[in-house]
Amino acid sequence: MTKSELIERIVTHQGLLSSKDVELAIKTMLEQMSQCLATGDRIEIRGFGSFSLHYRAPRVGRNPKTGQSVSLDGKFVPHFKPGKELRDRVNEDEEEGV
């Protein structure tokens, strides 16, 4: 699902807000979450999951075109850990054949 598809679904299922209002709310939420992670903070949405940063150590990679070894710097990457309710719901839907 893309961001625009999410906006359409929310507007369709809930008739009180306009498409522009929903779009602004989602963009604002995503921007705040991005800023939070950029400063090293953790985000927890109970029942859904948590977002945090994981450190990837420096390593030697390989250029897929040339096969040449390339040194890669260490970096932080966003990580999502689903909450119990989300895991249960996904598995419940899977068991029903969805």
UniProtKB/Swiss-Prot annotation:
The cross-references to HAMAP family, in alphabetical order and at most eight, read: IHF_beta
**How is this protein named in the record?**
Integration host factor subunit beta
Looking up InterPro entries in the UniProt record yields: Hist_DNA-bd, Histone-like_DNA-bd_CS, IHF-like_DNA-bd_dom_sf, IHF_beta
Could you tell me what this protein does? This protein is one of the two subunits of integration host factor, a specific DNA-binding protein that functions in genetic recombination as well as in transcriptional and translational control.
Q: How does it assemble?
A: Heterodimer of an alpha and a beta chain.
Species per Swiss-Prot/TrEMBL record: Pseudomonas fluorescens (strain SBW25)
Q: Which SMART domains match?
A: BHL
What are the UniProt keywords, alphabetically? DNA recombination, DNA-binding, Transcription, Transcription regulation, Translation regulation
A Gene Ontology biological process annotation?
A: regulation of translation
Q: Lineage of the source organism?
A: Bacteria, Pseudomonadati, Pseudomonadota, Gammaproteobacteria, Pseudomonadales
* Similarity comment: family membership: Belongs to the bacterial histone-like protein family.
